[in-house]
Structures are given as C-alpha cells and as structure tokens.
A protein has these predicted regions:
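Soluble catalytic domains of membrane acyltransferases
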Residues: 80-175
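Membrane-interfacial terminal anchoring regions of lipid-handling membrane enzymes
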Residues: 1-100, 108, 173-174
Length: 175
C-alpha cells in the first residue's frame, strides 16, 4: 500500500482481490475458508515440532526468540512502523483467569504484533503466556528472521498431517 496525492492509502491489487473475496465468502457464509492464495507448503510431521517445548534446545530457542521478538516489536513502535492509536476493552482481558481465544484477522502482517503488544499491556502478562496458532506454511516455509519467530515465539502450528494434529490437540489441552 502507498499513499496517494490526496492522502488516501492506495491498496495493492492483490489486497483488493482478497478484500473482494472476503466479501463474497461472507455473503456465502464461508467463514472457515482461507481467502488468501497461499503457496504450497511443506507438511509438518510430528518429529519436526515440539509443541510443549520439552527439549532443552526448544526451550532456549523460545526464550531467545521471544526476547528478540519483544525488541523487534518495541523498535516497530518506537520508529512509528506500527502505530496503536487506542486500546478498547483491556479490562476484559485483565479479567481472564484461565484461558482465552483471541482472534486476529491477520489481513495485515502487523495485526499479530498489535495483539501481542496489547497482551503485554494487560495484567495477565506477568503470569500467562500468549500462544499463537499459525498456519502450517508459516511454520515450515518461512526462512530468515520471520521464520525463526514463526517457529519459536510461542507458536502452535496447525498441520495437514493427522498425527501432528493429535499432538497439537494434546498440547492445547496441556497448556
């Protein structure tokens, strides 16, 4: 997206097509169908995921990734790459005593960062952890820094492999 002469933000053609598809799927009641044209993915198998971070290497990567992720997010905010104008309803998040499911439409790649920042602003940040359910391809296909974050920042990747999903469900029950 870029800003035009009139101050309006111009959206890229692929994003406009996704918006159109969202409207179409909403009319048809298809709320469980992905509107994105995602590339083919590498299947996540049980031996390639440690959902509960039981291995020492997984624990260390988790700590390091979350520390890096926190610095990355703080830098985005400091440099106005991400601007959070206001937060409504944080008192509801503060009332959560067990677990909660927070959804994010993830239309913008920074949507998840906003959810992360609001969670850190809440009273729950001290004694709870925010887990992110992510799509299989985000876990298996992404290289570099974002890939490292996707694999290690308290993420719970879905999988097209049934055995992996059994482990996913067990991990969710444990968490």
């Amino acid at each position: 997206a870029s800003e035009g002469n009139d101050g309006q933000i111009e959206k890229a053609q692929d994003r406009l097509e996704v918006l159109k598809k969202i409207e179409e799927f909403e009319r048809e009641g298809k709320f469980d169908v992905d509107v994105e044209e995602d590339p083919p993915t590498i299947v996540l198998t049980p031996e390639n995921i440690d959902y509960l971070r039981e291995k020492m290497s997984s624990k260390i990567k988790r700590i390091f990734a979350n520390e890096m992720g926190e610095r990355f997010l703080d830098n985005l905010l400091k440099n106005n790459k991400l601007i959070i104008k206001q937060v409504n309803g944080i008192e509801n998040l503060n009332k959560v005593k067990t677990g909660a499911l927070i959804t994010c439409n993830h239309f913008n790649p920074f949507d998840c960062f906003t959810v992360e920042k609001v969670f850190r602003m809440s009273e729950n940040e001290k004694d709870k952890r925010l887990y992110k359910v992510i799509r299989e391809g985000n876990y298996t296909n992404f290289p570099g820094l974002y890939g490292f974050f996707f694999r290690n920042c308290d993420t719970l990747p879905l999988s097209s492999n049934k055995r992996t999903m059994v482990n996913f469900m067990k991990a969710v029950d444990t968490i």
